Swiss-Prot record:
This is D-aminoacyl-tRNA deacylase. An aminoacyl-tRNA editing enzyme that deacylates mischarged D-aminoacyl-tRNAs. Also deacylates mischarged glycyl-tRNA(Ala), protecting cells against glycine mischarging by AlaRS. Acts via tRNA-based rather than protein-based catalysis; rejects L-amino acids rather than detecting D-amino acids in the active site. By recycling D-aminoacyl-tRNA to D-amino acids and free tRNA molecules, this enzyme counteracts the toxicity associated with the formation of D-aminoacyl-tRNA entities in vivo and helps enforce protein L-homochirality. The gene is dtd. One of its GO terms (cellular component) is cytoplasm. Its main location: cytoplasm. The lineage of its organism: Bacteria, Bacillati, Bacillota, Clostridia, Peptostreptococcales. Homodimer.
Length: 149
């Protein structure tokens, strides 16, 4: 499971002009599910992200998590995080999970975040979404549950 995590001042996602999720302050998480991912990957990544210390403390050091600062999450499914661009010019998505399994693990990730008290806004799985965000910093992290980077 892979995530691109961005610290944001605000964000929202719309599908066909309707807001489906929003975050007034916190983290925008683009989440990709790989074909070998399990519930354990969802749990690991949720715990890692909600406790990741990428918010500044009083000394302007990155010492606080989204939980510490009372922020929320906006989680967007994005299978393209498993796009392999090493050969040719068209990405291969063969390492991405099948839609049914990806949706299940995406929902499991959201549930794990909710279980630790996080407010989570979401997009719509497999929908064409418009994501609007005001990045803060910017601070952007790449996280992989298999620890490949």
């Amino acid at each position: 499971m892979r995530a691109v995590v961005q610290r944001i001042k605000e964000g929202k996602v719309t599908v066909e002009g309707e807001i489906t999720g929003e975050c007034n302050f916190g983290l925008l998480v683009y989440l990709g599910v790989g074909r070998e991912d399990t519930v354990e990957d969802a749990k690991y990544l949720a715990e890692k992200i909600v406790n990741l210390r990428i918010f500044e403390d009083q000394e302007e050091k990155l010492n606080l998590s989204v939980k510490d600062v009372g922020g929320s999450l906006l989680v967007i499914s994005q299978f393209t995080l498993f796009g392999d661009c090493r050969k040719g010019r068209r990405p291969s998505f063969s390492e991405a999970a099948k839609p049914d399994e990806a949706d299940y693990l995406y929902q499991e990730f959201v549930r794990c975040c909710n279980d630790v008290g996080m407010t989570v806004g979401t997009g719509v799985f497999q929908a064409h979404m418009m994501v609007h965000a005001i990045n803060d910093g910017p601070v952007t992290m790449l996280i992989d549950s298999k620890k490949t980077f």
